[in-house]
Each structure stands twice: as structure tokens, then as C-alpha cells.
Amino acid sequence: TGESYDTGDFVRILDRVGAEGDAAGFAARRASSAARGMLRGMGLGLYVESILGDPSEAAEVTFEADGTVTLAVGTQSNGQGHETVYTRFLAANTGIAPERIRILQGDSDRIPKGGGTGGSRSVTVQTNATLSTVSAMVAAFTPFVAAETGTADVRFEEGVFRAPGSNLGLSLIEAAEMARAAGRADLLRHRTEARLPGRSYPNGAHLVEVEIDPETGRTRIERYTVVDDFGTLVAPELVMGQVHGGVVQGIGQVMAEAIVHDAEGQILTGSLMDYAIPRADDVPFIRFFSEPVPSVRNPLGMKGCGEAGTVGALGAVANAVRDALATAGAGPIETPFTPERIWRALRDARAG
């Protein structure tokens, strides 16, 4: 494809997940499970993914008459917490109080071009566009502030316009109020489009241990450890939430989820009454660790994280179940690894 990985320390990721997941102690835990008549397996899943889609986005910042600020973006959150990230990012780079910032998403009247949300791209690409808009905004306001205050060598530092040797200390909100009073509507709305020079590649490792009851085929995930390299993290708590949700989705796909039809083609899993998804007691405690190697393909060093939990979970959980079955001479079997399929595989192995 002509693409190349931006950055990564894959050996460090592998070493860290083995240490945090206590891979060295697995043999003892497997023996303990066997003493109770259980089958225990360990699975490792290594992944590298790419932020996909158009690596460009637009961002528009508008200073409203009521003293608030609207950041219009081309992406659209559907539960990831983009509003929190975008607000926090704009506040950190402008000094504008977060409570004054409103996020407007996916409005094509304001942002004609937007790549939307998908492929772990939103925060990485959108914050790059926002940073570009902030830079353009500061560049436009600086000569205006200098002219209005009669001050030379105006600089924007830590959210405030300052000038050496003067007591100038003007926030962007105050500068916007001055611009409004002066009839400078051109300074009240700023929009730029920014394009990343290349894609970033999130990567990581999942280490999983499962225990199977051979009498029932029931599988429990006993240990789950994740080490990810997402580059620079803007909102670590949201990253952890996305990883947890992605892991659960991966567990569901491997262990339970399937579309079932009858002989006439009628779907039998048409609602959540029949379509199996993980419940709270199916989900283990997920230990998450970050080993960031900042990307060199965007100013903030971010790599994206949206789909990483699922991508890593699929192989790791499947490998753990197959490892456990192999101790009894069973498998491999196809997903989903339902209790019935696992029980049949073990029965067939015993029958020889």
C-alpha cells in the first residue's frame, strides 16, 4: 500500500503485557485449575491498526454575542466522549473557560466537509484541525490587539495576549468583545481545514486467561490485561472507557454473538431477547496500561484508539479458549465459542 508505520516499540509492549499479566505464573494457575477439574488456557493477541478515512478535517470557532464560544466540527460522537475531549483541548490551547465552550457536531451548514467518525480517526484528525484554527485565530487577533491597545510586540502566551514591558493582559474572549465593538465581524469566526501528512498506527497487546468447565462447556474469563500504545493521550479516562467497551464487544463476538436463521430463512435472533451479548457477570476486571510512543505524523503525537479494544480482544480471547481446549485434545472449533459448542468438542475428544 505504500504506507509505513509511524512509531512503535513492539517489544516493549510485549514485555510489559507479559509482566503485568504475570505470564510467568500461568503454569501454576493452570495446575490449580486442573486440580479442580477445570481447563485453563492463555491467549495473546497482538495488533496494529491504522486510523482510516480521509486524514483531513475542518474546525470552526465562533465567538457568540452572549460571550460563549462555539466549536463546529465535522465528526460526530456516538458515545465516545468527543465533546469532553474537544472542549478540553480548545480550553487548553486558548485559555477559554470550558463552561463557555459549546461543541457543534456534524452540521454540514457550518462545516461543509467532514470525514465523520470511524476508523479511530476522530480525535487525532479533528484536534489537528482545531489546532490549525486556533493558530489562525491567534494570528488574526494579534495585530488587531496591538493596534487597539497601542502596544507593540504582542504575543499570545498561556491564553492571554501580552506585550513585554507593558501591563497588557487580554484574553481571547476580551479581544473578541473589542472586535465586536469595533465592527470587526471577520474576527468573530475562524475556520480552517488541516490535513495530516500520514496515518498513525495504534498498536498493543492483550493477554487473556480463561477457565472452562468441561462438564458444562461454560467458559469464564479469569484474567484480562491490556497494554496499548496510543501515542499522546488527551483524555486518559475516556481512552480507558473505550478500551473496556471494545474488549467487551470482542468478547461478545468470540464467545456468544451469532445471527441464527431457521430452515426457511426466518431470523431467530431478531431482538436482544434472543441475540446473546455479554452481561456484566461475563466481563472480567480489565487491567489497562499505556505505553505511549508519540506519533510523528501529527503535532500532538496522537495515534487514535477507537477500535483497538475490539481488534485486540478477538484474537486474544480466541487463542485462550483454543489453548484450554488443546489441553484436553479438543478443537479447534468455530466461533462463537458457546457452551454447547465447547461441550461437544470436549465430548468428541473424549470419544476419540
Q: Which residues does each PLM region occupy?
A:
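Cofactor-binding beta-sheet edge motifs in enzyme active sites
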Residues: 1-12, 19, 24-352
